[in-house]
């Protein structure tokens, strides 16, 4: 179960995971639950609230998740729930990360063992607590040198021999969806709005010169970073269409720089933005592969299922080469129902 920073909705999957020589999976069912206006507004603004209000929403969101699971998983025997929750704070440099959707509450409401709070341990080990998906790229999507997810942030995992490293490339749908909503749309379907806009050269230059892009890996981004570094660059005089056009170009440049050979697997909601994908192709030297619709939309949720399975087996599911932690770990907290 996965909820991303782009606030597209709640991704639910039911999977069988099989371990022989390698890990494989079978996707049995998948669905995205669109957030209503209450949850969209609540999740977008919860970081501004006090601790008491956040705790209250933590519990009510857990009940919401549990109810959705009970409906979604009806007639299926579920051994384990792996819940990412929804990120409210993520500032690993301050040793802070918070994903709401209390795992104990979900377990008690559903009567199913629940693994949650996947980022906390890695942050305590001086890691970024992100990205967590690369272990799944390594185990389930071995044949692709690059795996790129175009979600709230564009992130990448890169395989070299039997090793993998990963990082967030740049903000993406967290920006594109915000400025699409200002125009009355949930998102920029097919990049139609961006395509109508013009590139703001000064903004593009300022974006491309952000210090984050010269930092060494591992590194990760957050909503807090976006608020401090991106929004101050966007003047009120700029039209939303031009902002979208400029940001598409910026993202394409940054993503294209990172994929220079072999085949790149693209997933996530941004993959449906054909204008963005064409701009990425323009800047990239890799062969771009776009999989089936369910893999595009549910790859991250599938991998969080694997993270939960690895945790229950007490196996490594978080890699220090990816997060910068002092050691590999088995992240997540196991909650058994009363």
Region spans (language model):
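Glycine-rich nucleotide/cofactor/substrate-binding loop typically near the N-terminus or early
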Residues: 16-68, 74
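Extended, folded domain segments that form the structural surfaces/walls around functional sites
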Residues: 187-192, 252-253, 273-286
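Glycine-rich phosphate-binding loops at beta-strand->alpha-helix junctions
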Residues: 88, 262-283
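Phosphate-binding/catalytic loop of phosphoryl-transfer enzymes
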Residues: 1, 92-97, 104, 108, ...
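Conserved acidic residues
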Residues: 78-79, 145, 262-264
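Conserved ATP-utilizing enzyme core subdomain
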Residues: 5, 9-33, 162-252, 261, ...
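Conserved phosphate-binding/catalytic loops in two-lobed NTP-binding clefts
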Residues: 283-303
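Short beta-strand-loop/turn "lid" adjacent to the catalytic site in phosphate-handling enzymes
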Residues: 49-103
């Amino acid at each position: 179960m996965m909820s991303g920073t782009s606030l597209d909705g709640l991704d639910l999957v039911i999977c069988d995971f099989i371990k022989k020589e390698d890990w494989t999976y079978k996707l049995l069912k998948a669905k995205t639950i669109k957030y209503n206006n209450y949850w969209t507004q609540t999740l977008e603004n919860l970081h501004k609230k006090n601790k008491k209000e956040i705790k209250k929403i933590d519990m009510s969101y857990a009940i919401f998740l549990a109810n959705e699971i009970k409906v979604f998983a009806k007639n299926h025997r579920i051994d384990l729930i792996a819940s990412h929750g929804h990120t409210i704070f993520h500032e690993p440099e301050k040793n802070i990360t918070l994903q709401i959707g209390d795992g104990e509450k979900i377990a008690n409401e559903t009567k199913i063992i629940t693994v949650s709070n996947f980022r906390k341990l890695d942050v305590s080990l001086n890691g970024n607590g992100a990205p967590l998906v690369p272990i799944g790229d390594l185990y389930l999507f071995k044949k692709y040198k690059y795996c790129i997810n175009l979600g709230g942030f564009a992130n990448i995992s890169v395989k070299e021999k039997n090793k993998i490293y990963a990082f967030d490339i740049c903000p993406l749908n967290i920006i594109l969806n915000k400025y699409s909503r200002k125009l009355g749309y949930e998102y920029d379907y097919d990049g139609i709005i961006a395509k109508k806009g013009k590139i703001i050269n000064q903004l593009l230059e300022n974006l491309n010169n952000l210090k984050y892009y010269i930092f060494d890996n591992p590194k990760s981004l957050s909503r807090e970073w976006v608020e401090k570094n991106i929004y101050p660059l966007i003047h009120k005089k700029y039209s939303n269409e031009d902002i979208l056009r400029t940001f598409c170009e910026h993202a394409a440049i940054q993503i294209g720089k990172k994929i220079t050979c072999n085949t790149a697997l693209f997933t996530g909601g941004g993959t449906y933005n054909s204008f963005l994908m064409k701009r990425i192709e323009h800047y990239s030297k890799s062969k771009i592969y776009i999989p089936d619709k369910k893999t595009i939309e549910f790859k991250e949720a599938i991998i969080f299922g694997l993270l939960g399975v690895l945790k229950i087996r007490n196996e490594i599911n978080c890699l220090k080469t990816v997060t910068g932690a002092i050691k590999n770990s088995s992240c997540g907290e196991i909650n058994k129902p009363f």
